[in-house]
């Protein structure tokens, strides 16, 4: 999978390639990440990428010419990409969208800056995507969030089991995790995790996931389609709640 980013701050985005799972995936050629500097596609000695808005108003607007020069170069070099513009006006970035984008072979993420991008650039854009209902100074951080999330669904980047068991892929929040020591500051690891009974461990983990989801994300709980393990875990939760009331 190829993911490319167009930005005026390439050094900021390059960091995503240097650490952890993403770094290893790049080194093993599981994913290819290319970072391009929009200023390299300007035509003046000052490498200008912005100008004053027609009609007046605060701030600057990113000029269209560098984007179109870059896009022509990119298509000739790598083929036509699925082009994303980071934008607070876009679709909300969530797990379903992550899965959808992970199936694309050639992604291009355009990072906005200033007051926005000349509207004519939208001819090149397939998707506007927002990582939340708030405004950032630029699209570089959203681009890095997208790269990290999308890469995890690319085959071979992390284990299939890890992807399946992560929060949101099951429709629930993750269960609590524990490691050594067995007791710390008077707090013990739940006994069920030490007994080696995998069925009981799975049931406990599902019960904890359901409990956490009910408490923190009831919206997810209400959308969840429950399987048999969920139903058994919910019954246990209900019994515990009744016993606590008693």
From Swiss-Prot:
- Annotated SUPFAM superfamilies: alpha/beta knot (SSF75217)
Gene Ontology cellular-component annotations: cytosol
E.C. number, please?
2.1.1.228
What coarse category fits the chief subcellular location reported for this protein? cytoplasm
* Positions contributing to S-adenosyl-L-methionine binding: 112, 131-136
Instruction: Supply the enzyme class, top level.
Output: transferase
Q: Does the keyword S-adenosyl-L-methionine apply?
A: yes
Keyword Transmembrane part of the UniProt annotation:
no
A Pfam family recorded for this sequence: tRNA_m1G_MT
Q: Where is the signal peptide?
A: none
| Gene3D superfamilies (alphabetical) | 3.40.1280.10, tRNA(m1g37)methyltransferase, domain 2
A single GO BP: tRNA N1-guanine methylation
Protein keywords: Cytoplasm, Methyltransferase, S-adenosyl-L-methionine, Transferase, tRNA processing
Reaction catalysed by this enzyme: guanosine(37) in tRNA + S-adenosyl-L-methionine = N(1)-methylguanosine(37) in tRNA + S-adenosyl-L-homocysteine + H(+)
Query: Which molecular-function annotations from GO does this UniProt entry contain?
Result: tRNA (guanine(37)-N1)-methyltransferase activity
Superkingdom of this entry's organism? Bacteria
Location in the cell: Cytoplasm
Report the function annotation for this chain.
Specifically methylates guanosine-37 in various tRNAs.
| PANTHER family linked | TRNA (GUANINE-N(1)-)-METHYLTRANSFERASE
**Self-association or partners: how does it assemble?**
Homodimer.
Which family does the entry's similarity section mention? Belongs to the RNA methyltransferase TrmD family.
Q: Mind telling me which HAMAP family this protein's record contains?
A: TrmD
> What is the protein's name according to its record?
tRNA (guanine-N(1)-)-methyltransferase
